[in-house]
Amino acid sequence: MAEKISPGMQQYLDIKQDYPDAFLLFRMGDFYELFYEDAVNAAQILELTLTSRNKNSENPIPMAGVPHHAATEYIDKLVDLGYKVAVAEQMEDPKKAVGIVKRAVTQVITPGTTIDTANSVDNNFLVAIDFKAKRYALSYMDLSTGEFKVTELSEFSAVVGGIASLKAREIVVGFPLDEAQVKVFERQMNLLISEQFEIPENLLIELSGLTALENQAASKLLAYVKETQMRDLSHLQEVEHYEIKDFLQLDFATKSSLELTANKRENKKHGTLYWLLDETKTAMGTRMLRSWIDRPLVSNSAIQKRMEIVQVFLDHFFERSDLIEALKGVYDLERLASRVSFGKAVPVDFLQLANSLSNVPAIKNILEVLDETSLNELRSQLDEIPELSGLINSAISENASRTITEGGIIKKGYNVQLDKYREALENGTSWIAKLEADEKAKTGISTLRIDYNRKDGYYFHITQSQLNSVPEHFYRKATLKNSERFGSQELTEIEEIMLEAREKSSSLEYDLFMGLRAETEQYIGRLQALAKTIAEIDCLQSLSVVAEKQGYIRPTLTEGSRIVEIKGGRHAVVEAVMGAQEYVPNDIELPEQTDIQLITGPNMSGKSTYMRQFALTVIMAQIGSFVPAKTANLPIFDAIFTRIGASDNLISGESTFMVEMSEANHAIQKATSRSLIIFDELGRGTATYDGMALAQAIIEYVHEYIGAKTLFATHYHELTDLDKELDHLDNVHVATLEQNGNVTFLHKITDGPADKSYGIHVAKIAGLPQTLLERADLILQKLENKPLPAKKIADEQEQLSLFDFAENSSEIIEKIKGQNVDNMTAREALNFLWELKDSL
């Protein structure tokens, strides 16, 4: 016979049925309880004691619990690990409930919807994707700030890159994923996948500025958030369309290899461009700076607008110092507004709002003192919101606590009735003191005192030795070992007045605070707009501080130009780490007629640093920053593509060579004449002649068909002869100094090709045994005295070229164009290469 389930457990099971993919925290009195499999798993993850309900039954129910006052800590831990948590609250007072207490889920907290993040600076983006007619829509929002955006993309790879850049932890999918897509999101990107296929009619977004697919994706994201949060989200901004082409395009591989916002070793901020440029003083400014680095501008007018203000701040040290001090007093307005919207704002949050608003006049005044036209727009957007600051300052006590149940929140004078209750409490305290003094005098009991506890209320404390002096109007309340507790009619009357005043005072104060919180909601939009303006001011002062500290200059950017001229350029991050005194600056010159710079030189000599230096300088310039150089004249680039470093993609089963070819293909397919391409040692992942052939073919293809400014570092010295064949290619090399058998890398870029690779010298630096090095040197001398086993690649008649094939050259080119490389497997790609080789 099956065991009968109690009404309480049946209620739990009914609720759990609606949330099978979440841990269900079931409120029971002062605890949140977990049962069955949830209890077993949570006990292990959270290190809770696993016990059981109905221990003596045949099938005891596993159970674990957490105190309600500490629940947030445990919920955060589960969410940080990628789990969902459904919170079921008691919907009525258990003392007044008839039968079982009503319970219901009031919120589902997920990795993408949590607003109480441990790191209050970083965004916490929730993304959603939808698909129709071979097009994707990508929408994202940050519930903790209210940001809500959407765009449409043509390729799945662009979707993946966008999500990776946002560092999202959860994705809402609006269509069934195939197996490969699930693998990418779950295994490679470690995303929690949630589904939202339907859109409730009342949540359908139909904005004219969005495509139908964008409206659909944004609607599904909004529906998911409403379904999980179960509350009005007044802080969510209207969904905003954005275009990838409005920004400098940087794919995830490029951002990773250039270490823009996360270093490759630890995936942390230290040692990145973000780390270097971050002198922001507000949380909003820090988030905005990161978004600027993720999405540099392509509009010269927008870039110059930022640079003008950076220049103003740079030229006015004292005003900038005052501005920095004022910014330090501004709290995270975006997160505070979100907490108000979520109904989670506590008294301290309102004090932070008031303190933040009190600094706005100072910020505004500094911009007025500077009296620069470039600051007019920002100055006009600084809304002091005097109504809100006045409301908070009149209502909230400066000594208010973090909780809303402890009292002491509302200021004296804000509410007449509350003041009366407080007066009664204060009078009661003085009445108690007077009664104690009177009874001491009447009874002659010098040790008599009035105390209070929850059980007995107010009482007279009298020791055992004084019991014979107790007056007749006292009545016994409790007997202890060495003393007794007594009451009196007068003490009881005072107590009743005080308890009523305390209860009513507490209740009224709570209601007043909730009213204040509700009234503040009308200012959320203005707070968010103010936060955005302050964030922008903060970012611009940050760039000016870094420019001054590091000795940067304002670059000249010319729209439509193809001239690159950087004098005394430095790698911004490397210089900051090692110090300006030790860093060797380099010029970078790519005149109108030069598209490709072929860079040769030994390993460890600085080729990669030189190339990264160029890319970082471009990115810095296009976010509006000054740059590390003596002078810099740059075109405006539309995209940067990089292939730097060798690495296998073990998760997707791709070898180093396959990753190289995939990234090279991506650059070749997407680059335009306005792009910057950086290829470092392309072709090293395969056999020497295969690698050399492919490297040359790629150089020729970029030269003939794309015309992008390209830095191509190679260890194939034979490729340096290409400058005789390709009009828009120049050779440069990293200079070395040889003296008495010793080699010094000068880290200086010089015109012309390198004549040696110095591989054995690099091995010596690495500490290989001397005997081994001497043997290697001997072998090298023998090899250098032998003729090459095949004709030199640069021999004019035998040169491999995509454009000097025999009669079938156009046929081969058409074959390459006709291949959908994105969908080829590694095996198919290799077979295709062999097929091309056979047809040469």
Swiss-Prot record:
Keywords per UniProt = ATP-binding, DNA damage, DNA repair, DNA-binding, Nucleotide-binding
Any one GO CC term of this protein is: cytosol
Q: Which GO terms describe its molecular function?
A: ATP binding; ATP-dependent DNA damage sensor activity; damaged DNA binding; mismatched DNA binding
Pfam families attached here?
Answer: MutS_I, MutS_II, MutS_III, MutS_IV, MutS_V
Q: Record keywords: Zinc included?
A: no
* Matching InterPro entries: DNA_mismatch_repair_MutS (IPR005748), DNA_mismatch_repair_MutS-lik_N (IPR007695), DNA_mismatch_repair_MutS/MSH (IPR017261), DNA_mismatch_repair_MutS_C (IPR000432), DNA_mismatch_repair_MutS_clamp (IPR007861), DNA_mismatch_repair_MutS_core (IPR007696), DNA_mismatch_repair_MutS_N (IPR016151), DNA_mismatch_repair_MutS_sf (IPR036187)
Matching CDD domains: ABC_MutS1 (cd03284)
SMART domains linked: MUTSac, MUTSd
Where ATP binds, per the record, is at: 601-608
SUPFAM superfamilies listed in its UniProt record: DNA repair protein MutS, domain I (SSF55271), DNA repair protein MutS, domain II (SSF53150), DNA repair protein MutS, domain III (SSF48334), P-loop containing nucleoside triphosphate hydrolases (SSF52540)
The Gene Ontology biological process annotation of the record reads: mismatch repair
Q: Which family does it belong to?
A: Belongs to the DNA mismatch repair MutS family.
Its biological purpose is as follows: This protein is involved in the repair of mismatches in DNA. It is possible that it carries out the mismatch recognition step. This protein has a weak ATPase activity.
HAMAP family reported for this sequence: MutS
Which protein are we looking at?
Answer: DNA mismatch repair protein MutS
